[in-house]
Amino acid sequence: FKEGNTVLLNIISKSGSTNETVMNSKVLLKELQKLTNDWAQYVVVTTQPGSKLEDWAQEYDISILPNPKNVGGRYSVFCPVGIFPLALAGIDILKLHKGASKMLVKCFDEDVENNPALQSATAVYRAMQREIPMHNMFLFDQDLERVGKWFRQLTAESLGKDGKGITPLVSIGSTDLHSMVQLYLSGSKNIFTTFVNVKNTGDINIPSIDSQFDEIVPELEKMSVDSVMDAIYKGTKESYENRELPYVEVILDKISEEEIGAFLQFKMVETMLLANLMDINAFDQPNVEEYKKATRRLLN
């Protein structure tokens, strides 16, 4: 800000009273107020209508983006809470929505062969019936890690209730092949896996250094990074198949707004279908308030 850069503070809380959000906002607002008397011009509030946060924003004529009351946080990626920060970051939100819209059409197809969400939900549910209660999203691209963490929240909050649930795990290839795969291959067979791989990641040829260094792993000679990662991915799947470990596979053409939008929509519909099969409500989170109430009691 002092160097002439534009600053925008986006305060996001669906309820308008999330402890951590209010705490962090107070710290940042105080710093912003030190820099300019017109601090309110640099703040945007995203919250549901009628919240205390909305009342405060109206008091200072702060811009407000309303988040629908009937859309939970984990499902709100295509609402202002999700798309406004993405737009600020330069993401093409129209392409994101385009991918989601195309996928939604597929997910409403009554023919299971053409419906990826129904196929995946059925596979996960069948695994649950075989007493496999854990679902590992194994993402073979570092850039998808945050998508994995979103999936973890989506699964846990939507499906973990009434004494039922699926425990979500998130793994990153190839990083977690060096930390978790021993457990996955030889531990208890209680994990269902969704492999997510990307076709086109922008290939890099592996250079030659010198004869001595090149001989350390001679198989890498004249290879590309993509070809090596593809071999690692296929080798991982082969190990799963040899041990008869259950999995499904999702292949993204590339990491793009349209592909990510489609994937997010696919997982949300899959979760709704799973909730229906499990006979639970996919859209509430009745027990989350317990820790919030306890926190406020301790703060008082």
For the regions a protein language model found, what residue spans apply to each?
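Hydrophobic/aromatic beta-strand patches that form the interior of the parallel beta-sheet core
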Residues: 10, 44-46, 63-65, 138, ...
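Acidic catalytic cores of enzymes that act on phosphate-bearing nucleotides/polynucleotides
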Residues: 91-95, 105-236
